[in-house]
A protein has these predicted regions:
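Rossmann-like dinucleotide-binding core of oxidoreductases
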Residues: 142-196
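N-terminal Rossmann-fold NAD(P) dinucleotide-binding loop
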Residues: 5
């Protein structure tokens, strides 16, 4: 249910494929949701170039233009709603929010036949069968459980010849935890009461 998962699901649905979009959170958007607030940047901001003439096309552009028109203030909760509407408007998509994939079943060494999910909100277990599966989870749970090769952290630029990729040690291997807070000027002192 992140941006890449939404785009994959909507594209498949528009091509006539019956699609199930599984999202482990209560909102869509992944890192771009109101829970994290890493805005959809794509080509417009890669390695700090902030190229105002760069622009994503396709579904990303459709989402960004719709958001710009309907959400002029950039409210992250409105983006959540817009993304939910985008998915719900596709009759070929079944959406499973608050559902975490935890295992896979394979019909052969190289082919997944089923994934298993659990919705913590209504205690429902899901068995989802299909011919194609897209792992856009961010942590690669489907690929990992299927036995695919994987790496943790960022690869160095020479691995794939990516000019904008970081050099060794340029940033840490894994993302840390984050704490989000708001602050505002109330125009007067505010008493802080620490939690008990």
């Amino acid at each position: 249910g992140g941006i890449s998962g939404i785009c994959a699901a909507v594209s498949a649905a528009r091509a006539g494929v019956k699609t199930i979009l599984v999202q482990d959170r209560p909102v869509l958007g992944g890192n771009a949701s109101s829970e994290v607030r890493l805005w959809i940047l794509g080509a417009t901001s890669h390695m700090g170039n902030n190229n105002r003439w760069s622009r994503e096309g396709g579904l990303i552009d459709e989402i960004l233009v719709d958001n710009l028109y309907r959400n002029k203030e950039g409210n992250p909760v409105l983006l959540d709603t817009l993304l939910l509407e985008k998915v719900r408007n596709e009759p070929n998509i079944t959406l499973l929010l608050n559902t975490a994939v935890y295992d896979v079943e394979k019909r052969s060494p190289d082919e997944i036949s089923k994934i298993y999910g659990f919705c913590s909100q209504n205690y429902t277990f899901y068995e989802i069968s299909g011919r194609l599966f897209c792992d856009a989870s961010g942590d690669g749970i489907i690929a990992y459980r299927a036995g695919a090769a994987y790496r943790m952290g960022a690869e160095e630029k020479q691995v794939y010849g990516e000019l904008f990729a970081p050099d060794k040690g340029e940033y840490g291997e894994l993302l840390g935890h984050s704490i989000y807070f708001y602050s505002k000027d109330t125009g007067k002192p505010v008493k802080f009461v620490p939690p008990a």
